[in-house]
């Protein structure tokens, strides 16, 4: 999540820290196992319109928060999935130890 880079709101510091750990693991492990032909990458989503917002009681939260996104809209789960599909493809065969940010420029 972009919280790893941007930080979390006061009550979400633990969430941001866990996301930062994923970034560190991705980069470090990617370097460690590259000579074995293993690629390690991650996707760092920004504000994404998913059902988690409705489950937390604010179904429009992604759209409400989109004002801080340069593209002025939340992302979609499919946009994140497309990044994952690219990372899994032969087109990304030289990509490892990388965290792809899917955040509309934020």
What positions do the PLM features span?
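Residue(s) in the substrate-gating loop at a strand-loop-helix junction
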Residues: 1
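Active-site "substrate specificity/gating" loop of NAD(P)-dependent dehydrogenases
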Residues: 5-12, 34
């Amino acid at each position: 999540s972009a919280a790893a880079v941007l930080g979390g709101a006061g009550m979400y510091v633990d969430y941001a820290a866990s996301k930062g750990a994923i970034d560190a693991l991705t980069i470090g492990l990617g370097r460690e196992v590259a000579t074995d032909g293993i690629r390690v990458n991650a996707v760092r989503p920004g504000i994404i319109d998913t059902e988690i917002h409705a489950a937390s009681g604010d179904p429009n939260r992604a759209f409400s928060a989109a004002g801080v996104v340069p593209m002025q809209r939340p992302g979609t789960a499919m946009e994140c999935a497309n990044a994952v599909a690219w990372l899994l493809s032969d087109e990304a065969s030289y990509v490892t130890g990388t965290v792809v940010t899917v955040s509309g420029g934020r």
